């Protein structure tokens, strides 16, 4: 998982009055120094997400992360989609570059008989899968809103 999604989670926690150190057990600088340019293992991100849900007592935290985190929390995805000339192009950008944010997720657009369906599949299933998919889908909803949908 890209550290960008961790920043989104930390943004929402700070909005709810929870310090990053309470979630991480160390300073934010120490964590990013440890990770460097590497991605955060998905199991570690899910453990942090579970801890964040417990700290905030908010079961829909993944949804809130996707809806209320700053645009900067989504890294290059926000400016790439905002520069797309059409929604179809923006969705193509998302499907092309989403592996940079998280492995194990497949986003696809299918169109049939005038109906467009956007699907987000998460490989593997565990109790936190719902929160994780909610985070991703909420980010997609933000993009749809930017296109007036």
PLM regions: where:
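N-terminal low-complexity or simple alpha-helical regulatory segments
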Residues: 1-119, 139
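Cytosolic nucleotide-utilizing catalytic cores of signal-transduction proteins
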Residues: 104, 108, 129-139, 143-149
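A short interface-forming secondary-structure element
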Residues: 119-131
């Amino acid at each position: 998982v890209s550290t960008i999604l961790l920043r989104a989670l930390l943004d929402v926690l700070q909005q709810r009055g929870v310090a990053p150190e309470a979630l991480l057990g160390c300073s934010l600088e120490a964590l990013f120094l440890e990770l460097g340019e590497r991605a955060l293992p998905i199991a570690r991100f899910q453990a942090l997400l579970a801890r964040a849900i417990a700290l905030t007592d908010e079961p829909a935290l993944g949804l809130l992360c996707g809806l209320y985190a700053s645009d900067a929390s989504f890294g290059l995805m926000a400016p790439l989609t905002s520069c797309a000339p059409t929604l179809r192009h923006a969705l193509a950008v998302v499907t092309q570059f989403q592996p940079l944010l998280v492995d194990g997720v497949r986003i696809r657009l299918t169109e049939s008989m005038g109906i467009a369906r956007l699907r987000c599949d998460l490989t593997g299933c565990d109790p936190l899968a719902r929160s994780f998919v909610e985070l991703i889908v909420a980010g997609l909803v933000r993009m749809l809103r930017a296109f007036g949908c």
